[in-house]
Amino acid sequence: MGLTRRLRPEVPMHLLTCVPAVCALGICRGLREAGDADACVRWPSDVILGDGSLICLGSHAGYEEGMYVDLALSLEGEGADPDLLERAVGWALGSCDQWEARLRAAGTVAGPLAPVLEDYFDALEGSNQEVDVVYPNGRVAASGVLAGVDVWGRVTVRCDDGREMDLAPEMGRVRPRA
């Protein structure tokens, strides 16, 4: 089951890249406030519920009568509550509105996640814990501790061999170490 919503945040185009992450953070916050203390964001922008269900966020940005981001939400998992997606959309839109207001109030920011960076990192699955870095082909590239995220949404893993590895979403994913 899924839903799609068009968002038109009034922010500079280069800041739109993090809209899915900002929306995932809002959904995670909403779930936690609703009693799901184990909800977390799977980097970069999916949300894991405490029961193991997953809210997947996808996006497509474009320009048609102004800039937009189409945000697609889908719910995966047995026993998933279909009404949850509607509530998730509300949480996502509210988070995007708050983010937009904070960007506007700040004037100039280092990057799109700057206003929510600490909250986003704290919500990430595996933050400050041992993780594997997995390439798109499924090969484990490195193991270490998920040490940070930057204002553009790239994660930093402090590898077991002492080096630091920065990872953009298109380069792979991180998962808790088995």
Where are these regions (language model features)?
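Primarily the active-site beta-strand->alpha-helix module of PP2C/PPM metal-dependent phosphatases
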Residues: 1-8
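Long, positively charged amphipathic alpha-helical accessory segments at protein N-termini or as interdomain linkers
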Residues: 8-39, 49-178
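Short Gly/Ser/Thr- and Asp/Glu-enriched loop/turn motifs at secondary-structure junctions
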Residues: 41-45
